[in-house]
Amino acid sequence: MLNIGPFSFHSRLLLGTGKFPDFDVQQKAIDVSEAEILTFAVRRMDIFDAKQPNLLERLDVKKYTLLPNTAGAKNAEEAVRIAKLAKASGLCDMIKVEVIGDDRTLLPDPVETLKASEMLLEEGFIVLPYTSDDVVLARKLQELGVHAIMPGASPIGSGLGIVNPLNLSFIIEQATLPVIVDAGIGSPADAAFAMELGADGVLLNTAVSGAKDPIKMAQAMKLSIEAGRLGFEAGRIARKRCATASSPLEGMSVVE
């Protein structure tokens, strides 16, 4: 089970809802992924205008936990305003904190992310900050009392996969709360690798919505995350420089 604050989930796949070709493909991809947490940018939805079509109209909101994010925020104050807007609309108190500090790389601003997380915790939110793979920042966020840490595998939408597995492994090893790898996942192999490192979950969007067949890719991501977690729990063999015979040699007789 993936436990975040008071919530428990069977699926370890968190799915973003943007950039799908149309609502039908989006819904089918969500269904086959079996994701229980769906994330979306509050700024890209007019959640107060009933005349504007949006994702929430099409979803059985009782079936999913919605994770609004603060994408578009440039500082802590903007992030808090967006989070309060989501809460006022009746959405979940759980919020993904996203404060971008660089428009080219879309990497998060560490100072403003820390500040926004602290402010939202004081407001009673369940806080999931999106961060870089900065080990020290992850520890500071943990000490602050956030409910999960979401380090990026690589820049948002890049599809580069996990470019710094060592840092991610350090973050996971020191964590006493869920670590959800977020951003940069490009393939099922990337998602499986994140889980093999010991991540508690993976959040992805573009890898599915931008695939040639988003529905098949959603299913592939589901299976790869399950396989990666199972492999982590099983425990891989140690790496060795030299070969080790896999067939027993003792107790065998050679018939001439």
Swiss-Prot record:
Enzyme Commission number, as recorded: 2.8.1.10
Enzyme class: transferase
Involved pathway(s): Cofactor biosynthesis; thiamine diphosphate biosynthesis
MF annotations from Gene Ontology: thiazole synthase activity
Keywords of the record: Cytoplasm, Schiff base, Thiamine biosynthesis, Transferase
Keyword Cytoplasm part of the UniProt annotation: yes
One record GO biological process: thiamine diphosphate biosynthetic process
Coiled coil spans: none
Origin: domain of life: Bacteria
GO cellular component: cytoplasm
Residue pairs linked by disulfide bridges in the UniProt entry: none
Catalytically driven reaction(s): [ThiS sulfur-carrier protein]-C-terminal-Gly-aminoethanethioate + 2-iminoacetate + 1-deoxy-D-xylulose 5-phosphate = [ThiS sulfur-carrier protein]-C-terminal Gly-Gly + 2-[(2R,5Z)-2-carboxy-4-methylthiazol-5(2H)-ylidene]ethyl phosphate + 2 H2O + H(+)
Subcellular location: Cytoplasm
Quaternary data: Homotetramer. Forms heterodimers with either ThiH or ThiS.
Family that this chain belongs to: Belongs to the ThiG family.
Alphabetized PANTHER family for the sequence: THIAZOLE SYNTHASE (PTHR34266:SF2)
Protein name (database record): Thiazole synthase
Provenance organism: Bacillus cereus (strain AH187)
Lineage, uppermost ranks: Bacteria, Bacillati, Bacillota, Bacilli, Bacillales
Gene, per the UniProt record: thiG
